[in-house]
């Protein structure tokens, strides 16, 4: 990790570098294929990696949480440790609700949040969040289907 981050930073500058991790802290009873590494000690593994990124002075750290229906949440002590060891911007993504993002933001653990599926169903998502408007529900049956249906046809909010 260190060698790659340093090499890229030397070419484009560390403030143009971001790194994404997808830490998985627990499994579920659900059978699934994990596309990545399931660590025996994810807390210490990722905290040590975050320290490497802090030392490299990169611009941001992106933490992608598992986003299936019964996915485990990141533990609170990991949120705290990530912020404690990384002074740049921290972006969280992966099944974030507005409420969860606000909790992480208010605790000072994160700076930015990715809302993939809610954005698909709510083309005006920032205005909905700002105004406390209800969100459209995502129709999962139309996702990943190969057409524009379910991607460009959700309505904007109207009273």
Residues of each region from the PLM?
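Flavin-dependent oxidoreductase catalytic cores
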Residues: 1-159
């Amino acid at each position: 990790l260190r060698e790659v981050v340093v090499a890229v930073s030397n070419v484009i500058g560390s403030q143009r570098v971001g790194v994404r991790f997808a830490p998985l802290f627990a499994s579920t009873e659900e059978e699934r294929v994990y596309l990545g590494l399931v660590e025996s000690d994810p807390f210490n593994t990722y905290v040590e990696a975050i320290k490497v990124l802090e030392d490299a002075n990169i611009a941001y750290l992106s933490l992608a949480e598992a986003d299936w229906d019964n996915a485990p949440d990141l533990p609170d002590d990991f949120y705290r440790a990530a912020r404690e060891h990384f002074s740049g911007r921290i972006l969280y993504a992966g099944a974030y609700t507005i409420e969860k993002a606000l909790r992480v933001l208010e605790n000072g653990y994160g700076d930015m949040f990715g809302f993939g599926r809610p954005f698909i169903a709510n083309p005006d998502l920032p205005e909905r969040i700002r105004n406390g408007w209800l969100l459209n529900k995502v129709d999962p049956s139309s996702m990943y289907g190969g057409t524009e249906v379910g991607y460009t046809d959700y309505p904007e909010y109207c009273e």
